[in-house]
Amino acid sequence: MNEGEILFQFTTWLIFLISYLIGSIPFGLLLTKLAKLGDVRTIGSGNIGATNVLRTGNKKVAALTLLCDILKGTLVILVIKFLTDPIENNIFISLAGFFAFLGHLFPVWLKFKGGKGVATYLGVCLGLYWPAAIVFITAWIVLFLITRYSSLSALIAVIITPIFVHFSYPYLYAHCILVIMSLLVMIKHHANIGRLLVGKESKIGTQNGGK
């Protein structure tokens, strides 16, 4: 391996590390503390995501948490797209988004106990291939309006989105990474799935349990 290849490998992994660290920023925890709403990990499901932040009763902080968690996935990809050829480096761009997603799920700052990845998943879709984000949002909204279950809406959305990408986006690497991300979201929702199956999952607006 020559000097140029070593530098390339170092730069690549450095970018992946930075992407992971950006994804690891626990906005739900930070914003609730800044708003003096307490530790979101002691509220509802104990999750640091926007749905659980909403259970504090502060819709503005919940919305800001959602936006920040989405942007973690989007900005990482858009910056790299701006600096490189988005077609030639599609796998590199996809992996950077994946590392940001992993950071949200397993943040080093919180002993690797993070969120469930739904918002950052959406952010990666938005940065990588915006029509996928539209499909995700549409699926989530339709399911939520029907069921009022945030968790179920997210689970259906992460199933539909990779299927859409498979038939509409030409880059296999991105599709494979999106499938892995969908599986991780499902794994993170294992408790929600259990509650859904026995009819004990809480809907948006309740104060306990849920996503």
Swiss-Prot record:
Its main location: membrane. GO terms for molecular function: acyl-phosphate glycerol-3-phosphate acyltransferase activity. It catalyses: an acyl phosphate + sn-glycerol 3-phosphate = a 1-acyl-sn-glycero-3-phosphate + phosphate. The keyword Lipid biosynthesis applies. It is a multi-pass membrane protein. GO terms for cellular component: plasma membrane. The chain crosses the membrane at residues 10-30, 63-83, 90-110, 126-146, 152-172. It holds the Pfam family G3P_acyltransf. Its EC number is 2.3.1.275. It is found in: Cell inner membrane. GO terms for biological process: phospholipid biosynthetic process. HAMAP family: PlsY. Belongs to the PlsY family. Probably interacts with PlsX. This is Glycerol-3-phosphate acyltransferase. It comes from Bartonella henselae (strain ATCC 49882 / DSM 28221 / CCUG 30454 / Houston 1) (Rochalimaea henselae). The lineage of its organism: Bacteria, Pseudomonadati, Pseudomonadota, Alphaproteobacteria, Hyphomicrobiales. The gene is plsY.
